[in-house]
């Protein structure tokens, strides 16, 4: 009897969660079309087509140019990006949008995860957390299927939370293309 009550309670909350996810936001908008620069976000560990050492140098120069406290983490970023088969430019683009590459972040959280209520011991730990979240969580399944940045951001920073999703996508693509 007790197990049956628990089952019904869990089933109720699960159906509520699914329903709220389905009906959240304005579904009349068309997703932003993929561009060549972001088309392979989940498909290629080295999206730039250059060697990993050249990617490392490019990341180091980018972080130095922006005076980022994330400087020195290039190896970890490339390793984690390769391990989870996610474009490192996506991670850096989100970090730039959310915290100016860690300058406005808190507790080694350059991605604004949980509105900074979640802290990390290092930027490397934050990279791995976000890479794993994006590549494993059911919330991002649409994005993994399409590779469309809009499908990622409409969940990562939804309009229902006050986010300007279209602007976020536009800026994210711009940041990614800088790399």
Regions found by a protein language model. Give the residues of each.
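Helix N-cap / loop-to-helix initiation motif
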Residues: 86-88
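Non-catalytic cell-wall polysaccharide-engagement segments
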Residues: 1-33, 117-179
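Cell-wall glycan-active module
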Residues: 1-84, 174-179
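Peptidoglycan-targeting cell-wall enzymes and recognition modules
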Residues: 42-63, 69, 90-147
């Amino acid at each position: 009897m007790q197990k049956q009550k628990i089952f019904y309670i869990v089933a109720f909350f699960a159906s509520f969660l699914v329903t709220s996810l389905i009906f959240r936001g304005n579904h009349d908008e068309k997703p932003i079309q993929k561009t060549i620069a972001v088309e392979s976000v989940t498909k290629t560990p080295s999206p730039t087509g250059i060697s990993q050492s050249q990617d490392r140098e490019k990341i180091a120069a980018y972080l130095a140019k922006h005076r980022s406290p994330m400087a020195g983490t290039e190896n970890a970023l490339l390793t984690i990006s390769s391990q989870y088969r996610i474009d490192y430019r996506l991670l850096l683009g989100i970090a730039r949008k959310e915290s100016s590459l860690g300058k406005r972040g808190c507790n080694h959280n350059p991605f604004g995860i949980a509105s900074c209520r979640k802290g990390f011991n290092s930027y490397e730990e934050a990279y791995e957390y976000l890479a794993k979240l994006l590549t494993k969580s059911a919330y991002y399944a649409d994005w993994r299927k399409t590779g469309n940045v809009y499908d990622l951001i409409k969940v990562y920073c939804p309009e229902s939370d006050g986010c300007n999703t279209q602007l976020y996508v536009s800026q994210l693509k711009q940041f990614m293309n800088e790399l």
